[in-house]
Amino acid sequence: VETWPGRIIFSGFEIGKDILTGKEVAQMSVKNSPIKDAYQMSLSQDNPEGRNSWDQTAVLVAIKGYKPYFKIKLGTIQINDTTGTNQWIDDTAGKHAYLIKEMPEPEIAAIIENYMKHQPLKK
């Protein structure tokens, strides 16, 4: 992380744990959808209200940017190569950042769910 040329935005555990998605995807009528099928299987075995959205929130920020969904805290993460431990240092000029929730979880979940329900157009 020290030598990465651009900004790194960390999306922590707390970001995706309460943003539940997949319920609407699992109920779609589309056939042969690996995403729909995976959610149907996992929701029946886990939480029927949805799955935690750690990956989806990271992808949302990577594609659309962090605003208006989140705020960021600037700083620098230092990683000890020997122990694997890390330390965050607040720094308004830092090239690292971590996400802080800005919008309510259900609103972010609805936005992500809408993207996940998108079907490709036939050409």
PLM features: what roles do these ranges have?
Residues V1-K123:
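N-terminal acidic, glycine/proline-rich low-complexity segments
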